[in-house]
């Protein structure tokens, strides 16, 4: 399996959390976006969830209630993931204002690729769905407290 890493993120951070399947590769364009966002923010970020195995392995994605068409699931012959969930390494930085800043940094870093961006109270989902010919998508968790 091809290992991948960037300036700030290493292959081990993208591995499936099932601990059994060995999947750990995400699209290199996604890693570039994450690195650019990290450079912009100037603070450490952490991958909560990288590639996730599906029914062909231990079905970690299904076990955690992930979408059947999740961008975390391996795509193509290379079995690479196209999405990750990311947050700040320091929990004190996970305020609504900072989560919004992370969202904006990812959106800027991803141009011109059509991204999927999901805003949650303590993490952001980001994927490079445009590389699969899909349109961009934006959503927010109903519990996200917009900064005032």
Task: Identify the residue ranges that each predicted region occupies.
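Extended, low-complexity, intrinsically disordered C-terminal regulatory tails
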Residues: 31-66
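Short amphipathic alpha-helical surface micro-motifs
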Residues: 28-30, 60-63, 106-111
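Helix N-cap and loop-to-helix transition residues
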Residues: 10, 27, 53, 95-98
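Active-site acidic/histidine clusters and adjacent loop/turn architecture
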Residues: 1-44
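Catalytic cores and adjacent binding grooves of peptidoglycan-active enzymes
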Residues: 68-84, 88-148
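Compositionally biased, low-complexity repeat tracts
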Residues: 2, 15, 46, 58-62, ...
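Solvent-exposed, flexible loop/coil residues
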Residues: 13, 18, 55, 64, ...
